């Protein structure tokens, strides 16, 4: 490809609205352009990268036994009503009507469509197991699209679905797909971690996320410093402290705490360690339809944070988790939110394991501007239940029993689930088993954010000059950069001959035939991340040599013209 025929849209300045480095470089290097909030046009350079990622994903899915299909992006809302997700999915699901006022949705995922397809196409256990996949655009109406294609509203995704008669067969396919995902990210040369994960709105029984480690990641990943254990912080279990709870040594005392509005204020006011305090949060309780709304108290150690996902899994807590209103707080505790405590509460009290291990602790007195010291669970509080409801923190013992927890940021680029029979039961997806009876199928689903991988790769592979692509997904393998070609027939002749040879050999080459200053040309290629530059200058041609520059290492060397082709053998 010649730059004179190529849409090379580089920018010198960083756009003001680009927050993370991948978004900045994708705009500056001319990979994408923003159309509207969360919507991007892929320009030629970006599309070349995207297609290479897509092809690696496709190859590994086929190697894992996947059959490629393509399903409609627009889906009948009736399917989502049938699965029970139409109302549950929330405002991220874009709903539309056709000219006949029939309701449709713009697909954020395709469980319903593929389940209906398989229910209609399969009739016998002899057709199982089946694994199908597609690579297609999805749409999720994110409330705050950000970070460029990392969290856009429209994005390219590979979603695969497997169907099985028995759970044992699902487990085997799940492991095959897990291994395929690892191969994909290894081929992409990404530093990644597979981690245990929550199943979220898709549902299911077992789940792993695949995270590319990067400081710009939106997820916290907890992993052991002594084993292979890794989990999303939403999923990582916080173990109960070792040993027995200490016996009480203090008497229960109420103390004045005027103007205390936060845990930090409390620590300063009473000169206590935050680890010896507890905080009490009131949330809406789970109720049966028609019953009055209730509230539930969640109690954590003062230095710990509530894990909302864990709390939502408790049967006593409404889903999605909703914090109590001021009116509900006053009715339940007779004080403002900053003074709530577990002593004397006449509602259900759920205490985190670490908080339950405390003795002689400090808590709110359920009275404005007052707290209690010397509090002990068995002596001073009504009945409580103890659960793991907090986020793990660095230094916690790993739940695997080996080492301690470390925390790093990650960008989620893949997610696999064992869905079980949730969708198949709802949509009557069954086949005749060996005994001639109808048997509901069990499912797995497996997603990869193809467009997000491009951004994640940049987050891990860049320097102050631009992108440093992994070889497998670089837009071009090499660029020819002739110096002052317009003034030197010899430079032009050498560049043209080299371009022709590389093209004939199937090498992806970008011939920079612009009438530009060398500095501008070098800056553009460094920004775009072209792995190798072949720099042709009049002086080196006297010795039948050209300069070779490696974008990854920064090394420069002279190479004989007739040795150039050997670089790609």
Curated annotation (Swiss-Prot):
- Primary location class: cytoplasm
- Quote the subcellular location field of this record: Cytoplasm
Reactions catalysed: tRNA(Pro) + L-proline + ATP = L-prolyl-tRNA(Pro) + AMP + diphosphate
Coiled coil, from the record: none
The top EC class, named as a word, is ligase
GO CC, sorted alphabetically, is: cytosol
Q: Where is the signal peptide?
A: none
Any one biological process term the GO annotation gives: prolyl-tRNA aminoacylation
The UniProt keyword set, sorted, is: Aminoacyl-tRNA synthetase, ATP-binding, Cytoplasm, Ligase, Nucleotide-binding, Protein biosynthesis
Cite the EC number: 6.1.1.15
Pfam families attached here? Answer: HGTP_anticodon (PF03129), tRNA-synt_2b (PF00587), tRNA_edit (PF04073)
Q: Which InterPro entries match?
A: aa-tRNA-synt_IIb, aa-tRNA-synth_II, aa-tRNA-synth_II/BPL/LPL, Anticodon-bd, Anticodon-bd_dom_sf, Pro-tRNA-ligase_IIa, Pro-tRNA-synth_IIa_bac-type, Pro-tRNA-Synthase_IIa_type1
Q: Could you tell me which SUPFAM superfamilies the record lists for this protein?
A: Class II aaRS ABD-related, Class II aaRS and biotin synthetases, YbaK/ProRS associated domain
Give a short account of what the protein does: Catalyzes the attachment of proline to tRNA(Pro) in a two-step reaction: proline is first activated by ATP to form Pro-AMP and then transferred to the acceptor end of tRNA(Pro). As ProRS can inadvertently accommodate and process non-cognate amino acids such as alanine and cysteine, to avoid such errors it has two additional distinct editing activities against alanine. One activity is designated as 'pretransfer' editing and involves the tRNA(Pro)-independent hydrolysis of activated Ala-AMP.
Q: Domain annotation text?
A: Consists of three domains: the N-terminal catalytic domain, the editing domain and the C-terminal anticodon-binding domain.
Its family remark reads:
Belongs to the class-II aminoacyl-tRNA synthetase family. ProS type 1 subfamily.
Question: Subunit comment for this entry?
Answer: Homodimer.
Its name, as the record gives it, is Proline--tRNA ligase
Could you read off the lineage of the organism from its UniProt record? Bacteria, Pseudomonadati, Pseudomonadota, Gammaproteobacteria, Alteromonadales
State the gene name recorded for this protein. proS
């Amino acid at each position: 490809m010649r730059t004179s025929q190529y849409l090379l849209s580089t920018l010198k300045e960083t756009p003001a609205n680009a927050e993370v480095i991948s978004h900045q470089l994708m705009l500056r290097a001319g990979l994408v352009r923003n159309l509207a909030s969360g919507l991007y046009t892929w320009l030629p350079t970006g599309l070349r990268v995207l297609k290479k990622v897509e092809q690696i994903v496709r190859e590994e899915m086929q190697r894992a036994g996947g059959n490629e299909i393509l399903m409609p992006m627009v889906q009948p809302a009736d399917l989502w009503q049938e699965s029970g997700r139409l109302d549950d999915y929330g405002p991220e699901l874009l709903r539309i009507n056709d000219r006949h006022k029939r309701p449709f949705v713009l697909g954020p995922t395709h469980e319903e469509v593929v389940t209906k397809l398989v229910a209609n196409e399969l009739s016998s256990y002899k057709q199982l197991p089946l694994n199908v996949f597609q690579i297609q655009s999805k749409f999720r109406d994110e409330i705050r699209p950000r970070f460029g294609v990392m969290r856009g509203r429209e994005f390219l995704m590979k979603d695969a679905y497997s169907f099985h008669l028995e759970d044992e067969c699902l487990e085997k396919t799940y492991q095959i797909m897990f291994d395929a995902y690892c191969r994909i990210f290894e081929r992409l040369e990404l530093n990644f971690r597979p981690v245990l994960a929550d199943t979220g709105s898709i549902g299911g029984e077992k789940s792993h996320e695949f995270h590319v480690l990067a400081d710009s990641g939106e997820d916290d990943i907890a992993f052991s410093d002594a084993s292979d254990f890794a989990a999303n912080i939403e999923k990582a279990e916080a173990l109960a402290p070792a040993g027995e709870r200490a016996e009480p040594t203090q008497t229960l005392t109420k103390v004045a705490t005027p103007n205390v509005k936060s845990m930090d204020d409390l620590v300063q006011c009473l000169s206590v360690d935050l680890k010896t305090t507890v905080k009490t949060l009131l949330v809406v309780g789970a109720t049966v339809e028609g019953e009055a709304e209730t509230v539930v108290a969640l109690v954590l150690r003062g230095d710990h944070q509530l894990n909302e996902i864990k709390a939502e899994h408790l049967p006593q807590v409404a889903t999605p988790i909703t914090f109590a209103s001021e009116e509900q707080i006053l009715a339940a505790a007779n004080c403002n939110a900053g003074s709530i405590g577990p002593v004397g509460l006449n509602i259900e009290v759920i205490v985190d394991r670490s908080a339950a291990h405390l003795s002689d602790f400090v808590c709110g007195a359920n009275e404005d501007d007052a707290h209690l010291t010397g509090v002990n669970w068995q002596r001073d509080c009504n009945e409580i239940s103890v659960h793991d409801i907090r986020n793990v923190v660095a230094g916690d013992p790993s739940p695997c029993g080996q080492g301690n927890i470390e925390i790093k940021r990650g960008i989620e680029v893949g997610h696999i689930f064992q869905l079980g029979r949730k969708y198949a039961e709802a949509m009557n997806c069954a086949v005749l088993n060996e005994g001639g009876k109808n048997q509901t199928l069990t499912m797995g689903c497996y997603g990869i954010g193809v467009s997000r991988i491009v951004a994640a790769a940049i987050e891990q592979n860049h320097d102050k000059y631009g992108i440093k692509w992994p070889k497998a997904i670089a837009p071009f393998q090499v660029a020819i950069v002739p110096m002052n070609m317009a003034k030197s027939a010899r430079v032009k002749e050498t560049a043209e001959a080299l371009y022709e040879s590389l093209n004939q050999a199937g090498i992806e080459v970008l011939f920079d035939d612009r009438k530009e200053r060398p500095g501008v040309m070098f800056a553009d290629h460094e920004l775009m991340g072209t792995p190798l530059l072949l720099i042709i200058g009049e002086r080196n041609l006297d010795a039948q040599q050209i300069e070779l520059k490696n974008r990854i290492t920064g090394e420069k060397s002279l190479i004989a013209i007739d040795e150039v082709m050997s670089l790609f053998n």
